[in-house]
Regions:
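Fe-S-dependent hydro-lyases/dehydratases of central metabolism
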Residues: 1-918
Length: 918
């Protein structure tokens, strides 16, 4: 059977000759003769159009779907569902391990049903990069990297053996070993090709490189002109197994960039500005495409930084078309010359090349003159909350005022007791200015609100960008020369996304200065950005906990959600790598770095940020040290791994041999009874509310990735299995064990359940008894009582990481529906993919306007009649006082394909049932 379309309704199949090579392409220019003028389509939509032409089969891709993309130009929007097939899949290990567990479980289910387990195999290339498991246990010394790698291998040996089994058992499945880099940076520097090649019937086809990834920051690759975005692991698994991505033709927001960044302004400042602008615009579920003459001078690394943060500005992707800058980067990073020639020829032939003055048709537009961008951070709790560098102290002080302001009833009580306002103010002042001390390396230091305890150069967002990395090194050099040192209470680290970074820092002579300040290499992986910051020194943790200090982290990452970076660090600030180092020097965020000194130099004079900030000319001079040989050297053996990786013993079987005593890899229950027909969809009757949550509940809140508390349900389970707390590892590393993960669902210590008055922590009220329980324990009691459950929430439910366990855990707790004001794209899809119904309040109603307290009984009508996309359903409510009411909700099953997945119990159930039937 042909892999690509042999229907060719639009006579698009043509031969493209580049040099001495011939390639088959589905020509958009040829298709235009039937489709009409499509030249003005956004280039990101042209990629989708080519995909439909190539996979036209009159079943999943029909002529009408192809015409719908051309018709988009008339209305600049569409309600047409299409079936999109990306060329490949990218994974990291936190999401990759549970995905491979699912594939292994599907093989077991296939064998149990009497089928061939090897039918469960990726049909398109899958690359899994192990980058999420390294933690910053050791830092600020020359041995930190080796020690952290050793601990990583000890902690994760079982997981890594499982991944090595997967690499040997599945076709089209490659693993990049630990200690190599971050998946998105490895993708940018090596895996991505801009134009992909495929063989069919003895011929070579050329087409746009496209992908989906099991990490929300897969979007980074759009900086290279490669269309890609994050999906949940379950959706990625379905894509691997040949299931198309079901999607509506998106709206495309054009973002025009003009001008140039001013001296001293970084790509980080630019991306934080863009993130704020697009969040205010509202681009959830939409493509963003960048255009304008400003792109001509915007380096590829800056484009990748902007594309990386698409999840933070809410878009499906932030796409940069291919141009001369793209070709220059492909050449720098060592891509083959014939592939670079093909990228240029193909892009120009297909109208995918960016020409000066291009003005595609967009749904809507906004623009930014880059010369207006100012030095910025984002914080303290959301990446879209940009704060000018000069405003950081004021922002923090305002936060502290709110934090320390006594409650109205407490103030009234004090006044009635004769304490008056003075006592209240004195209490506030005491909390604000009390300076507990901590002993570090034998010396006592004060620790206060606003002190920086973590300063981390981390994350592919910025470590993929030589300009800001070299700026950090130059700032470190100037700081050392002035006689400055990092403050001793600051945990500092350098964790690049690629070994090339340390090569060019060393070649530029900057490594010794970073090391002297304590920014030694700690690993090649995500570390602090995803919460793998490791423990703080014990005296610092004790001081924070004893005095309830609001301390800070400053990191060059892309997310700063509450509780993500470190559970004891309440405020987190995103900043460029040189600013990360600057805050490590000053040691607090109360100092205005634009007007106040960072410290005192060895000459006794105050040193200001402007005294050590590198000029663009200085940065440009050391940028010359970045060369192609570095990329060739580091990627020549990218799949080989070190001796400890190669020494891992690999089981030889094609089906996985599950170990009953494993606490990392367990046979999940998702496919039990898969041989039986799916049960018909019924109304949800007499459900209880498990939790009432507010706005911006992240997938970190729902399924944390970081530390497992000893006294949590997951911690107690692990101790019952004989695991000591020091060996708990993290939730993220335990995602191959459903027993841990379901206990960790809604277990983030910063989640606030309104049923408990907004108290922090993963607890709830078991309504019939009135007992306060951990959410997991309450859910299990409800299951024993055969009571279905719902979650009530506010806006942006499920924002953040593409974390399929946020949906899997919700399913395993017995939650049948989530009713929210709005959903983030990936989590909504994941809920459907796990058979959980996403429902949206309508007509401006909210949990507050409906007076939902969590003590009601909920019934959801209209499901048993046959569910449809975007159907209005009725919710019946019975209050604790017996008063009945009802309200309507919008069913957020968005496509007909999703209806089929939901009816089957989930997307993987749908795929597996079809494979068993065949």
């Amino acid at each position: 059977m042909a892999k690509y379309s042999n229907i060719n309704s639009f006579n698009a199949l043509q031969t493209l000759t580049v040099g001495s090579s011939n390639y088959q392409i589905f020509s958009l220019t040829q298709a235009e003769k039937k489709l009409g003028d499509i030249a003005k389509l956004p280039k990101s939509l042209k990629v989708l159009l080519e995909n439909l032409l190539r996979f036209e089969d009159q079943l999943s891709v029909k002529t009408e779907h192809i015409y719908a993309l051309a018709e988009w130009l008339k209305t600049r929007t569409s309600d047409q569902e299409i079936q999109y097939r990306p060329a490949r899949v990218l994974m990291q290990d936190f999401t990759g391990v549970p995905a491979v567990v699912d594939l292994a479980a599907m093989r077991a289910a296939m064998a149990e049903a009497g089928g061939d387990p090897e039918k469960i195999n990726p049909l398109s290339p899958v690359d899994l990069v192990i980058d999420h498991s390294v933690m910053v246990d050791h830092f600020a010394d020359d041995q930190a990297f080796e020690e952290n790698v050793q601990i990583e291998m000890q902690r994760n040996g079982e997981r890594y053996q499982f991944l090595r089994w997967g690499q040997s058992a599945f076709n089209n499945f490659s693993v990049v070993p630990p200690g190599t880099g971050i998946c998105h940076q490895v993708n940018l520097e090596y895996l991505a090709q801009a134009v992909w090649l495929g063989e069919d019937d003895g011929q070579t086809f050329a087409f746009p490189d496209t992908l989906v990834g099991t990490d929300s920051h897969t979007t980074m690759i759009n900086g290279l002109g490669v269309l890609g975005w994050g999906v949940g692991g379950i959706e990625a698994e379905a894509a691997m197994l040949g299931q198309p991505i079901s999607m509506l033709i998106p709206e495309v927001i054009g973002f025009k960039l003009t001008g140039k960044l001013q001296e001293g302004i970084t790509a980080t400042d630019l991306v934080l500005t863009i993130t704020q602008m697009l969040r205010q615009k509202g681009v959830v579920g939409k493509f963003v495409e960048f255009y304008g003459d400003g792109l001509a001078d915007l380096p590829l690394a800056d484009r990748a930084t902007i594309a990386n943060m698409a999840p933070e500005y809410g878009a499906t992707c932030g796409f940069f078309p291919i141009d001369e800058v793209t070709l220059g980067y492909l050449k720098l990073t060592g891509r083959q010359s014939d592939r670079i020639a093909l990228v240029e020829a193909y892009s120009k032939a297909q109208g995918l090349w960016r020409n000066a003055g291009d003005e595609p048709v967009f749904t809507d537009t906004l623009s930014l003159d880059m010369s207006t961008v100012q030095a910025s951070l984002a914080g303290p709790k959301r990446p879209q909350d940009r704060v000018l560098l000069s405003e950081v102290p004021k922002t923090f002080n305002a936060l502290m005022e709110l934090t320390l302001k006594p409650a109205k009833e407490a103030k009234e009580r004090l006044e009635n007791e004769g304490g008056g306002g003075t006592a209240v103010e004195a209490t506030k002042a005491n909390i604000q200015h009390e300076s507990p001390s901590c002993v570090i390396e034998g010396q006592e230091y004060p620790l206060n609100h606003g002190d920086v305890v973590i300063s981390a150069i981390t994350s592919c967002t910025n470590t993929s960008n030589p300009s800001v990395m070299l700026a950090a090194g130059l700032l470190a050099k100037k700081a050392i020369e002035k006689g400055l040192q990092r403050k001793p209470w600051v945990k500092s680290s350098l964790a690049p996304g690629s070994k090339v970074v340390t090569d060019y820092l060393l070649a530029a002579g900057l490594t010794p200065y970073l090391d002297e300040l304590g920014y030694n290499l700690v690993g090649y992986g995500c570390t602090t950005c995803i919460g793998n910051s490791g423990p703080l020194p014990e005296p610092i943790e004790e001081a924070i906990q004893c005095h309830d200090l609001n301390v800070a982290s400053v990191l060059s990452g892309n997310r700063n959600f509450e509780g993500r970076v470190h559970p004891l660090v309440k405020t987190n600030w995103l900043a460029s790598p040189p600013l990360v180092v600057a805050y490590g020097l000053v040691g607090n965020i109360r100092t205005d770095l634009t007007t106040q000194p960072i410290g005192q130099g060895k000459d006794g004079q105050p040193v200001y940020l402007k005294d050590i900030w590198p000029s663009q000319a200085e940065i440009d001079a050391v940028l010359q040290k970045v060369n192609t040989d570095m990329f060739h050297k580091e990627y020549a053996a990218v799949f080989d791994g070190d001796e400890s990786w190669q020494a891992i013993q690999i089981p030889k079987s094609k089906t996985y041999e599950w170990a009953d005593d494993s606490t990392y890899i367990r046979h999940p229950p998702f496919f039990e009874g898969i041989g039986e027909p799916p049960k018909p969809i019924k109304n949800i009757e007499q459900a209880r509310i498990l939790a009432v949550l507010g706005d911006s509940v992240t997938t970190d809140h729902i399924s944390p990735a970081g530390n497992i508390k000893k006294d949590s349900p997951a911690g107690r389970y692990l101790q019952e299995q004989g695991v000591e707390p020091k060996d708990f590892n993290s939730y993220g590393s335990r995602r191959g064990n459903h027993e841990v993960m379901m206990r960790g669902t809604f277990a983030n210590i910063r989640i606030k359940n309104e049923m408990l008055g907004g108290e922090e922590g993963g607890n709830t009220i078991h309504v019939p008894s009135g007992e306060k329980l951990a959410i997991y324990d309450a859910a299990m009691r409800y299951q024993q009582e055969h009571t279905p459950l719902v979650i009530i929430a506010g806006k942006e439910y499920g924002t953040g990481s593409s974390r399929d366990w946020a949906a899997k855990g919700t399913n395993l707790l017995g939650v049948k529906a989530v009713i929210a004001e709005s959903f983030e794209r990936i989590h909504r899809s994941n809920l459907v993919g796990m058979g959980v119904l996403p429902l949206q309040f309508v007509d401006g109603q909210t949990r507050q306007s409906l007076n939902l307290t969590g003590h009601e009984v909920i019934s959801i009508r209209g499901l048993s009649d046959g569910i449809q996309p975007h159907e209005i359903l009725e919710v019946d409510v019975k209050g604790p006082n017996g008063v009945a009411s009802h309200f309507n909700v919008l069913c957020r099953i968005d496509t007909l394909n999703e209806v089929e997945y939901f009816k089957a119990g989930g997307i993987l159930h749908y795929v597996l049932r079809n494979l068993i039937a065949s």
